Amino acid sequence: MPRRTAFFISDRTGITVESMGDALLNQFEVNLKRENHPFIDSPEKAHQLVNIINATAEKSALRPLVFSSIVDEEIRNIVKSSAGLHLSFFDAFLGTLEKELGVSALQFSPRINSIINTERYDARMESLNFTLNHDDGSSDRNLQHAEVILIGVSRSGKTPTCLYLALQYGIRAANYPLTPEDLQSPNLPNMVKPFRNKLFGLTIDPERLSKIRQERRPNSEYADILTCKREVSDAKAMFYRFNLPYANTTHKSVEELAVHIMQTCHLKRRY
């Protein structure tokens, strides 16, 4: 199958345009080469990028796809002059919204927008610092301020999920690893026991868990499939015993897990 190049262009980090572009591209079975170009925030950078896109178009029989989330109209128009198929999310929706709302778009520059978003940034960083300070049961200091506490066996996906909750939603997320001693106890671990209403369990298929642990400690009891089966079974028994909500991480992305946790625990994003 011929390979087409897809450019993801933004005047900021590019996360939004990648997500929206992927949502569209996932509907098609195509062979793609990806190129990410964040921080295209000046006419000079835009012209340089146009040269790259045009050079790619000349080398290929397939027109490049250009996904753009650039706010500035001047920069956006420069990128549109390239030989690629330009798909701008602002061009697609701003006109319709302006007509419906009866007002013109503000066309904030990235610099002004970053100043306006200072409060959101501060909330995100505060949540991230909290999550890092309460990763893997490292501290119970100020644990009462956690909005959710993920518990599960080692390598079940607690840390990446907490980090995503903090960065994407501004949630103060802590996590605690269930040790063999915890799993044999009829009680909740002492550190998290006072916060039962904030607990959310993560489980994982034993086979997947064993594979992940083998990468960390090959041929160890820790990674043995029987150990993994026992720990997963004991963890699920704990979740049932204390009627804790939980989710299986095996076939869920971090994004899907985060949304599920937000909905199940009735959490509100902080920005």
Curated annotation (Swiss-Prot):
Catalytic activity as recorded in UniProt: [pyruvate, water dikinase] + ADP = [pyruvate, water dikinase]-phosphate + AMP + H(+); [pyruvate, water dikinase]-phosphate + phosphate + H(+) = [pyruvate, water dikinase] + diphosphate
Q: Which UniProt keywords apply?
A: Kinase, Nucleotide-binding, Serine/threonine-protein kinase, Transferase
One annotated GO molecular function is:
ADP binding
Top EC class of this enzyme: transferase
Pfam families from the entry?
A: Kinase-PPPase
Q: Which residues bind ADP?
A: 152-159
Keyword Hydrolase appears in the UniProt entry: no
EC numbers, comma separated:
2.7.11.33, 2.7.4.28
- Give me the disulphide-bonded residues: none
Membrane-spanning regions, if any?
A: none
Q: Which PANTHER family match?
A: PYRUVATE, PHOSPHATE DIKINASE REGULATORY PROTEIN 1, CHLOROPLASTIC
The free-text function statement in the UniProt record for this protein reads: Bifunctional serine/threonine kinase and phosphorylase involved in the regulation of the phosphoenolpyruvate synthase (PEPS) by catalyzing its phosphorylation/dephosphorylation.
| UniProt-listed NCBIfam families | PRK05339.1 (NF003742)
Which family does the record claim for this protein?
Belongs to the pyruvate, phosphate/water dikinase regulatory protein family. PSRP subfamily.
Q: What is this protein called?
A: Putative phosphoenolpyruvate synthase regulatory protein
